[in-house]
Structures are given as structure tokens and as C-alpha cells.
Amino acid sequence: MASTLSTLSVSASLLPKQQPMVASSLPTNMGQALFGLKAGSRGRVTAMATYKVTLITKESGTVTFDCPDDVYVLDQAEEEGIDLPYSCRAGSCSSCAGKVVAGSVDQSDQSFLDDDQIEAGWVLTCAAYPSADVTIETHKEEELTA
């Protein structure tokens, strides 16, 4: 008994022409934009949280925006077109001082505020990551230093 092999061949001229997709042509933050994921070192992927930040400002009133947990509140506010005071951008002065009304932030990168001030709700927006949905009154430097 003889067996027969059959194959199907399709001429390339019958298939629609498409440009090949090259990985380098994709946006580098594709996974972050689509799935809230961020590439880590050695190919690891970490989930990234995003929180609602509400700023109560003198000029703009109340403004709310989404802020990833690895972006400083001041930096994201600037990306959103919100003008906030700042000077050092390193958490070592009080120009960007605000007061947390609700929620919480991680401001372990700052060196200006002492533990009592942090416990009282003071925040430096240039060195504060949101750690939950948070509401912050801005433009509070004079009140902090009084």
C-alpha cells in the first residue's frame, strides 16, 4: 500500500502585501499604555498602579488627574498642564509644599519635612508619589514656614 503526501502551496502573489512589523517600530511603553504594566530588568514585568490625584489650587480651583505610582505628583501635574510652584525639585526646600486633605502619598525621597510635619499632612509635591487616591491643597509654603 502506497501512501501519498499532498501539499498545498500558495503563490505569494495571491497574498496581500504588508509591511513587516519590526519590534523596534512599536512604542516602548506599549504594554504600559495597554495593560498598566511596566517592563522591569531581566524581562520581568511589574504591575503599575495609577491613582486619582485631586489638587485644590488658588488659580485653577479643583483639578483631578491620573498619576502612576512611580511618578511624582508635581511632574504629572506639569504633564497635565497644571502650573504649581517649585524650586529645587529634590524635596529639600518648601516651595512646592502642600497639605494632604485625604488619601496618602509616599514621600520618602524628600529630606526637608520632619516626621511631625508629615504626620500633620504636609507634603512636598516634587518628591511625593501617590500611594492611594489623594487630595492635596497646594501653594502652602507660607503656611508651612510661618
UniProtKB/Swiss-Prot annotation:
Residues reported in the UniProt entry to bind [2Fe-2S] cluster: C88, C93, C96, C126
Free-text remark on how the cofactor is bound: Binds 1 [2Fe-2S] cluster.
Annotated Pfam families: Fer2 (PF00111)
Any one GO molecular function term: electron transfer activity
All copies of domain 2Fe-2S ferredoxin-type, residue ranges: 51-142
GO CC terms: chloroplast stroma
Entry's localization field: Plastid, Chloroplast
Family (UniProt): Belongs to the 2Fe2S plant-type ferredoxin family.
SUBUNIT field: Forms a complex with heterodimeric ferredoxin-thioredoxin reductase (FTR) and thioredoxin.
Protein name: Ferredoxin, chloroplastic
Organism field: Silene latifolia subsp. alba
